[in-house]
Amino acid sequence: MATMIQSLSSLFCFLSLLSLLFSTNLTISESDHIHMSTFCNQFSDNFTQTSTYETNRETVLSSLRLRSSLGSYSNATAGISPDTVRGMFLCRGDISETSCSDCVQTATLEISRNCTYQKEAFIFYEECMVRYSDSSFFSLVDERPYIIRYSLSYAPNLDRFPQTLSDKMDELIINATSSPSLSSTPYFVEDQERVKQFEGSFDIDSMAQCSPDLDPRNCTTCLKLAVQEMLECCNQSRWAQIFTPKCLLRYEATALSSPPPPYPSPPPPSSPLFSPLLPSPPLFKRPQTASGFSGSSSINVIKGN
């Protein structure tokens, strides 16, 4: 009897340990976020360990963590000059409050670990960004640093896609700057459109967002600068995302049908007095995929100050 009780006790301990390990792995997996880049401003002043600035920085980052469950944006300030620290976070408007909070929690911890003594730093994840600085940046447009992530797969209808994308971005900017009265998330708009062209049909999903501390004019400026960088970088990519300190853009194009076949060649004339006609070339040339390109591959473009 004692042996049976001991065996059951051992089995219970084993199952409890297994359950704990499983729940721990699940928690870690759910909290994973795609880190894109960290910028520690090497040109800013440094602070020393246990200094007033370090204390104020931790106060700001802790405040951002606490506020991350309340919305997609918040800012915080701590201390008096010359040790004033300002911070903010911005989450993508299309993610849940839980995902936003998890991302900000991770970002605020990592930025202090990676930028140990710099007075200004930025950290970009696919779902959020966090920054702090000794300089005031609220209500101002910052073009850099920024991070672009894009696919190495070509977009559909390659010959016409850059213009289609440019037109879509212009439309998004107009809608985003008028969204404070249209959306629960200020300066956020997402769109899905089915594009029908002779070469084939495709869906294009897109979104644009500005930090709520910007006014409509500065939001427009920020998004236009982001569009310019994205179009110069990757206007032939199937998807791309750019994240700047004050705004972000994303798009993804999904082909729905293949281009139609070329028109058939006319039959050769029956009269032997004429040579047979050569086959007509295709009206539209389909883009060739570069060696090594695939749908799952992507690349980051990073530009600092």
Swiss-Prot record:
Residue stretches of biased makeup (Polar residues): 288-305
Lineage, top ranks: Eukaryota, Viridiplantae, Streptophyta, Embryophyta, Tracheophyta
Name of the protein in question: Cysteine-rich repeat secretory protein 4
Subcellular location, record wording: Secreted
Signal peptide: 1-31
Pfam families: Stress-antifung (PF01657)
Gene Ontology terms: cellular component: extracellular region
Transmembrane regions listed in the UniProt entry: none
Keyword Secreted set for record: yes
Keyword Acetylation applies: no
Residue stretches of biased makeup (Pro residues): 258-271
Similarity field: Belongs to the cysteine-rich repeat secretory protein family.
Ranges where the record places region Disordered: 258-305
Keywords, alphabetical: Repeat, Secreted, Signal
Primary location class: secreted
Domain Gnk2-homologous: 35-137, 143-256
